[in-house]
Amino acid sequence: GVAEEIAQFTVDETQLGNYDGKFLKIQRKTRATLMDIIDDKSVGIIEELPERNIVKIAKPMGVIGALCPSTNPEATPVIKAISAVKGRNAIIIAPHPRAKLTNKMICDYMRDAIVAMGAPADLVQSIDVPSLDKTNELMRQCDRILATGGEAMVGAAYSSGTPALGVGVGNAVITVDDTANLDEAAEKI
């Protein structure tokens, strides 16, 4: 299947990790992300508190610039794309050069799936020939950055002038907002 193809291709291209680990990330992390948010409201009125005259409204941010590492190219682009598209945002993925072919393969699969669901393919785009200049330009032009990678890359995202969320080596960004079940979130974190 597709997951097996991507797992093997990732290991072959990057020479990082192993097939079983990559396959499990695809199966577990990407599906878990989708299942965690599939029923959540992500645009429009997401909550009403009539007793306080409060209506919470979520809206798209625009174009998300996603910086992805060579160490997890099989799952990171998918997870970022799920989150972006769920919020009716477009996403442009800037892969590490060592994982550019894996990224292209995954983006092509995602674009096909998006079209099959009746949405425009260009909601998900990738930089097929990545370079530092192109990534820097993406960070200047996009509306929000989601950066996953080494300290220098995440630091560049934070100092780009564009609002950014970054995940460095061994860390994970977890946003717990006021719509979260705090007991459940604490247990999972």
Language-model segments: what does each one mean?
Residues 77, 106-108, 127-132, 180-189:
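Active-site glycine-rich loop that binds ribose-phosphate moieties when present
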Residues 43-56, 124-142:
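A structured beta-alpha segment of the ubiquitous adenosine-cofactor-binding alpha/beta core
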Residues 1-54:
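N-terminal Rossmann-like NAD(P)+-binding subdomain of aldehyde/semialdehyde dehydrogenases
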Residues 58, 72, 144-153, 164, ...:
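Buried, small/hydrophobic-residue-enriched core segments of structured protein domains
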Residues 79, 86-87, 154-189:
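ALDH superfamily catalytic-core signature
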Residues 93, 125-128, 146-149, 164-167:
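General beta-strand structural signal in soluble alpha/beta enzymes
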Residues 38-112, 117, 160-162, 171:
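Conserved small-residue-rich beta-alpha loop and adjacent elements
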